[in-house]
């Protein structure tokens, strides 16, 4: 049985509750939308929703994969909601966002793994929200670069795809996805030259600093210019336990190392998540 590791003081989370938080919650629920904020039990939901920002999750709320770090429901998804792209775009307008972030569940049940739905969502956001910048956090599309090209051609401002963890731990942490497939997706995005390629990773799953630095080097070699590094927090008892809580000082050390290695932007702190302060990553 895994030993329980006590959560340290620096991981105390600010709860939401101001007027903007309530307004954001109302808009999301009123359009029957899903957010990774709620499905992933994100520790920054209170802060972000209180600032009027949210990360929209398209493709429904049931994922075809079962990554052991993730709290999103797993199973057989419902058919795509054809109105979802418009609802997301309208919610962005109602929130008055200048920058929006969209992610999705994996839809391995669909012939195109949800790529066309992604494109429609990006197009609707552009149509309804002139001037809004957009980051998309995409799945690996099982390494189908023709599908990745569909996302690139839709012209979001940033395309993100998370490596999530170091090479050694990938088979036990992620489902279906492989480290090399994710690197290939990131390389393909970067080689397009049309937008920044961004990735993210979690710490506290048993990785070593040497392995973290290897991931940084691999990401840089693939052309990644933006990276986020945060503490893994076990969202439920069915998920992987936390092996170690990394100190804020260790995160700052990694941030400085990442800058020295050549990342244009690096966010590294215990509560950093892939879309946290995403407007800074353009």
UniProtKB/Swiss-Prot annotation:
InterPro entries: Aldolase_TIM, Elp3/MiaA/NifB-like_rSAM, Lipoyl_synth, rSAM. GO terms for cellular component: cytoplasm. Binds 2 [4Fe-4S] clusters per subunit. One cluster is coordinated with 3 cysteines and an exchangeable S-adenosyl-L-methionine. Pathway: Protein modification; protein lipoylation via endogenous pathway; protein N(6)-(lipoyl)lysine from octanoyl-[acyl-carrier-protein]: step 2/2. Keywords: 4Fe-4S, Cytoplasm, Iron, Iron-sulfur, Metal-binding, S-adenosyl-L-methionine, Transferase. It is found in: Cytoplasm. [4Fe-4S] cluster 2 binds at residues 63, 67, 70. [4Fe-4S] cluster 1 binds at residues 37, 42, 48, 275. Pfam families: Radical_SAM (PF04055). Its cofactor is [4Fe-4S] cluster. It catalyses: [[Fe-S] cluster scaffold protein carrying a second [4Fe-4S](2+) cluster] + N(6)-octanoyl-L-lysyl-[protein] + 2 oxidized [2Fe-2S]-[ferredoxin] + 2 S-adenosyl-L-methionine + 4 H(+) = [[Fe-S] cluster scaffold protein] + N(6)-[(R)-dihydrolipoyl]-L-lysyl-[protein] + 4 Fe(3+) + 2 hydrogen sulfide + 2 5'-deoxyadenosine + 2 L-methionine + 2 reduced [2Fe-2S]-[ferredoxin]. Residues 49-264 form the Radical SAM core domain. GO terms for molecular function: 4 iron, 4 sulfur cluster binding; lipoate synthase activity; metal ion binding. Its EC number is 2.8.1.8. Belongs to the radical SAM superfamily. Lipoyl synthase family. This is Lipoyl synthase. The gene is lipA.
